[in-house]
UniProtKB/Swiss-Prot annotation:
One of its GO terms (cellular component) is cytosolic small ribosomal subunit. One of its GO terms (biological process) is translation. One of its GO terms (molecular function) is RNA binding. This is Small ribosomal subunit protein uS9. InterPro entries: Ribosomal_Su5_D2-typ_SF (IPR020568), Ribosomal_uS9 (IPR000754), Ribosomal_uS9_bac/plastid (IPR023035), Ribosomal_uS9_CS (IPR020574), Ribsml_uS5_D2-typ_fold_subgr (IPR014721). PANTHER family: RIBOSOMAL PROTEIN S9 (PTHR21569), SMALL RIBOSOMAL SUBUNIT PROTEIN US9M (PTHR21569:SF1). Keywords: Ribonucleoprotein, Ribosomal protein. Belongs to the universal ribosomal protein uS9 family.
């Protein structure tokens, strides 16, 4: 009998993550590499694994992630969102816990566009009185 796979899609900024959960011993693979090898920074790894720590399921699932787009911070946030959604599929009782922390909500904040006449989104050129 094949193992049951749980799936979740996560997004943050310009990053999109496809997350698969399978019963296992807690291995997290991101784009074919170990999570610590992929990110390198402990803070990003902690961000991505937050839903597992919160629901106390850290050693219960093997996680395979494919993530594209954005930078490392956006990708870590997308993985967190995807893992949360997949955990919800695995056990609907986690909804209250995950929702209270805001892990099920897509973070809609995006980079503000640059406007013409300005140097950046809001940065104006230096003003000279004379």
């Amino acid at each position: 009998m094949a193992d049951v796979r749980y799936y979740g899609t996560g997004r943050r900024k310009h990053a999109a993550a496809r997350v698969f959960l399978v019963a296992g011993d807690g291995k997290v693979t991101v784009n074919g590499r170990d999570i610590s090898e992929y990110f390198g920074y402990e803070t990003l790894i902690m961000t991505a694994k937050e839903p597992l720590v919160l629901t106390e399921t850290e050693g219960k699932y093997d996680i395979m992630v494919t993530v594209k787009g954005g930078g490392f911070t956006g990708q870590a946030g997308a993985i967190r969102h995807g893992i949360s959604r997949a955990l919800l599929q695995a056990d609907p009782d986690f909804r209250g816990t995950l929702k209270a922390k805001g892990f099920l909500t897509r973070d809609a904040r995006m980079k503000e566009r640059k406007k013409y006449g300005l140097k950046a989104a809001r940065r104006a050129p230096q003003f000279s009185k004379r």
